[in-house]
Amino acid sequence: MKVVSSYGVEIKKQNIPIRHTLYIYRQAVGYLIRVYEESWEELSRIVNLQKRFNAAEHLVHSTKKNRARYDFDQKFPKMPSYLRRSAIQHALGSVSSYETRLELWKQKKLDGKPKLVYENHAMPVFYRDVMYKEAEDQTDRAFLKLYDGHDWKWFSVNLLHTDMEYLRENWSGVKASAPTLEKRHHKYFLRFSYTEEVSLSKKEVNEQIICSVDLGINTDAVCTIMRSDGTVLGRKFINFPSEKDQMYRVVGRIRRFQREHGSGQVQSRWNYARRLNMELSRKVASAITTYAQNNHVDVIVFEYLEMKGKAAGKKKQKLRLWRKRDIQKLCEQQAHRTGMRVSRVCAWNTSRLAYDGTGEVIR
């Protein structure tokens, strides 16, 4: 099984033209989306995706043997070839998705007419050797080819030391994909993806050891290590009270601010609360998988928690802040990296009925 993991390395603040590069790349993608929307009837006849991509590139890029139909090369001169192909791929995907959704809408299989967005939020990929180079002396630096407003030049960028230490410690020897530029919280990152080939546990059901996880609101998780015959080998209560207390205090301050000033200026405060909540999810997921790994578990079992509709009652805000799905997704990613499987069971009657099917549990 292939497991893909990614990690974002922060680019330290310095005088490099990242915003110029991002602007020109998004302008190129927007231009290409308009071109391929006009030419989609011609491109859609080409079934083979590679041939369709080649035909799309020939429409906008001139060579010795090809004369482009559109003036892309004049509008975006000297754009690196790999960056141009990345923009073409993004534009083709956007137009193809729009046309597919439009057909579904015409067949009344989709509610609401889809809209093709030209003002996109595409992020460039820095392909190795032509757009991105690592520093040879193993320092916290890299070289990126960026647009300075006049030409494409190589710039040295400093990367955050702690992020680079993490990559050297945990991902040394694993081949990384070309980094993608990312912007989060007014900061820029280079996101690296790593692909690993892992083999999951193949033990027979009767020989498996499972970790049953009961996610909760007051107590973050209760982990029980069990054999197939019901023998309990261990139990652990996972709770992060200080982190939850910090988050609830932030939510309380937001509530008081909204009561006095309205809800027009609280977006940044809610973003901070969400980041605290997501960090809590990461800690809970890491604690679950670490405990399961220490007990040589084959399968981590969760309840399938599906909560639809409007929550009611005094605890409705706590229910909405409960990131049960994020915890399960993070656990699944971490468990697969270590060879453990993840399973989900229906939550109905899991406390009422006995594990072996003998009936209701008398308490």
Where are these regions (language model features)?
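Nucleic-acid substrate recognition interfaces
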Residues: M1-R363
